[in-house]
């Protein structure tokens, strides 16, 4: 039985780089590649069909990888919740690192890179499951009385004697 085919969306600044990456990724038999010219086209596609991974570019002026990742993570209409994002960057600065962490980018690959290296990283990223971040919840008040008299509440407001 063949492994399921995974969908990879590619959105980079340079059309030549986009075609090279798309052609190289399409060489892997387990990948279906969808290149996009604009962020709007990518978002529209993701509303209609799920993708497993997005390759984005930090050098893309209209849609930087961190802004794209924030939009993808914040959009509840996108069907795939475990969407992974790989960003391509020509320079890795502290600002780029912080923006990537804040936006939820899973991996950064430095340009120039070998297209084969990108294929290896995409396949490795798709092979392991994405760990979903826990949802933030409000603090619960715990009733410690069920543990008996041995539990001493440290932060209970007691009237002064």
Indicate where each model-derived feature is located.
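Conserved acidic segment of CheY-like receiver
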Residues: 2-16, 21-25, 35, 54-55
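Short hydrophobic/Thr-rich beta-strand motif most characteristic of the beta2 strand and flanking loop
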Residues: 30-38, 45
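Conserved phosphotransfer microenvironments
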Residues: 48, 52-81
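Alpha4 helix (beta4-alpha4-beta5 surface) of REC/receiver domains from two-component response regulators
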Residues: 67, 91-107
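C-terminal output helix
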Residues: 113-122
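CheY-like receiver
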Residues: 128-161
């Amino acid at each position: 039985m063949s492994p399921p085919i995974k969908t990879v969306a590619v959105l980079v600044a340079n059309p030549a780089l986009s075609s090279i990456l798309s052609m190289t990724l399409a060489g892997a038999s387990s990948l279906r590649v969808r290149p996009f010219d604009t962020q709007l086209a990518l978002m529209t596609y993701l509303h209609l069909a799920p993708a497993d991974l997005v390759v984005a570019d930090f050098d893309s002026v209209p849609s930087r990888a961190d802004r794209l990742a924030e939009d993808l993570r914040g959009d509840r209409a996108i069907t795939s919740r475990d969407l992974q994002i790989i960003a391509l960057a020509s320079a890795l600065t502290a600002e780029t690192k912080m923006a990537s962490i804040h936006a939820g980018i899973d991996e950064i690959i430095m340009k120039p890179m070998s297209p084969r290296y990108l294929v290896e990283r995409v396949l490795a990223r798709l092979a392991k499951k994405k760990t979903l971040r826990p949802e933030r919840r409000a603090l619960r008040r715990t009733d410690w009385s069920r543990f008996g008299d041995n539990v001493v509440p440290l932060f209970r407001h007691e009237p002064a004697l």
